[in-house]
Amino acid sequence: QAAIQEDEKMAKNKYAGTQTEKNLQEAFAGESQARNKYTYFASVAKKEGYEQMSALFLKTADNEKEHAKMWFKELAGIGDTKANLEAAADGENYEWTDMYENFAKTAEEEGFPELAAKFRAVGEIEKHHEERYRALLKNIETAQVFEKSEVKVWECRNCGHIVVGTKAPDVCPVCNHPQI
């Protein structure tokens, strides 16, 4: 099934198999990494008392986020929520079953046991991320996002009003904020 999904995704990506696709992937990765670096740099600047420099790093990070989003869209990387949950779960699965385990083995072979342990620990976190995404996907597939078989506590994401029941209200009875 993963191969079928990949084929469907490739059909949406008009750049599939080209150097342009590789360039778009590199642009997306570069902009994504720059965004994260700049948010880290903003934290340091703020801690050191450089509020204006911190704000500039954050503004630039937001610009880089938009650049990354542009390239990711070109690669047909953004779907509906169901497709995004599937892609996220698959990505997390790769990270914990393959990537981090291989990184850990290499780190051990090269004499970095502490780093190997850290790679494995992060791999465990990625496993939980996959499980969470798959549970959310199941909620969509079984129409259990806003309705459960057992009583739950539902909180309005706008005003904080609490409703206890099997179904979230379509509209908050306090602030009239819609469920969706």
Predicted regions and their residues:
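Short, Lys/Arg-enriched N-terminal segments with co-localized hydrophobic residues
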Residues: 1-9
